[in-house]
Amino acid sequence: AGNVIMRKAATPGMESRKGIVLQAHMDMVPQKNGDKAFDFVRDPIEAYVDGEWVKADGTTLGADNGMGMAAILAVLESDDIEHGPIEALITATEETGMVGANGLKGGMLRGDILVNLDSETEGELYVGCAGGLDASITFSYEEESVPASSMAFLVEVKGLKGGHSGIEIVLERGNANLVLFRLLKMAEKAFGLRLSSVDGGGLRNAIPREARAVVTVPAAEAGAFRESVRDFERTVREELRGVDEGVSVTAEEAALPASLIDTDTQRRLIRAVHGCPNGVVRMSPSMKGLVQTSTNLARVVSSGGRIAVQCLLRSSVGSEKRDLGERIASVFELAGAEVVLSGAYDGWN
């Protein structure tokens, strides 16, 4: 499973103390800005210090869960802390399915108490964690020819802050996929917009920061379409004031695509994505400020006759998580898509 287990003997005289397991995970969320040339397999993170913060240039930093690993290594290296038996458990592939944790076998660990260090706030203890569920949606489409007298545009949504869908979802930041599909729906109605391709979001547990689509409109509507995009950008900026003020929505003329997504599939796709639940669904009734149930519309991408949509659902209440999955399935099944709910794992409190 790729896990690493390390052990440190107890301080002399403390061998009978209960053993402590310090746990973190070694993988990170590998996300970058669209204009950043970066290979997460080969390239080192370009970290820099900004005041009291360590940041990364155009990519995620990996503090989730590099901070936890650093804390564990500091404890293992120290010689000024008296302690009982200590084990360090560094699990693999946490971000994409808890693979390392699921690969643990009984008897591998000797400790009595496990302390998970996948957190970012000093001096606080977590008393629960949400469970998760993946919703994978697939549309099939036929290719249609581009109508005569069409103009093509690359529509891009950029500049959103994004964030971890299990942490920053409560901040109600913009979701690039939803911003894009809101625009597509408006322009489809107003200008007869046709969709050729779409590529929005990235990883399932990251709030989408960027999304783009290649579209066409009748040449006679091109000027009005451009102006409507500028108006739409102003509207979105106003709505996200104080939350995601860096958002930009642009439409730049592009080469005509070879084909378009068929009209029927386009119509069903745009309405289903636009109507998909996203963000905070319910706050905890018993703990102020705690998100109980949420969902992240993480990915929309077209390729080779198929359009894939991916959502990651979270809830500390199992029944709510399952029901939310069925709600999302209902939206997309009504739109003629195939829906698979998988990868469920339980929360705890």
What are these regions (language model features)?
Residues 5, 21-23, 87, 134-138, ...:
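Beta-strand secondary-structure signal
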Residues 59-63, 167-171, 202:
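Alpha-helix capping and helix-loop boundary segments enriched in small/acidic/polar residues
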Residues 177-349:
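Metal-dependent amide/peptide-bond hydrolase catalytic core
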